[in-house]
Amino acid sequence: YGPSPKLVRLNREGFTLVPGLKRKTPVYPGMLLGEHPAPDKGDLFASIHGEISEITERSVFLAATDPSKDAPEVEPVDLLGQGLEGDELALAVKKMGVNTRSLGRRCKTLIINALNPDPGVTWAEPMLVSHVENLRTGMELHRRMARADNVILAVPKGSKVAYEGIPLAY
């Protein structure tokens, strides 16, 4: 993990904040702060241990504090194990704070872009080697949301990565 920010600004436009949320409210990572009515806009969650320092018309500001001893832990959720697909899965992911607009469109073939985003940026390939289970899980979740028949992983030409059961395109 990297350094934690001292102050976090969260966009609250369009969100209905949870009742009782106000300045000085203690927050912890994964705490629900607001819900968005749009089906493809992820709900709003705290990302750090801290307290609400300010709420404006457009933002919620969180000031970092040391975690309290009684702060709840966020429990992992096994979305694959729940067997959800399509809109039901997209709604479950939305309730976890993920914007799903580009994830849930139905398609026959889903192409996952694993290319480095910009020239000189070289983190994508090491991630493909060291985080294979995360990659598989993410690809399966995306496949289920899009109800795709085929999933292809696009990797850089000359890439040395290979995965059992995952077709590659160069």
Model regions: which residues?
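Conserved hydrophobic positions within beta-strands
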Residues: 50-52
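Buried, small/hydrophobic-residue-enriched core segments of structured protein domains
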Residues: 46, 56-170
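N-terminal, Lys/Arg-enriched amphipathic/low-complexity engagement segments
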Residues: 1-20, 35
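Short coil-to-beta-strand transition motifs
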Residues: 41-48
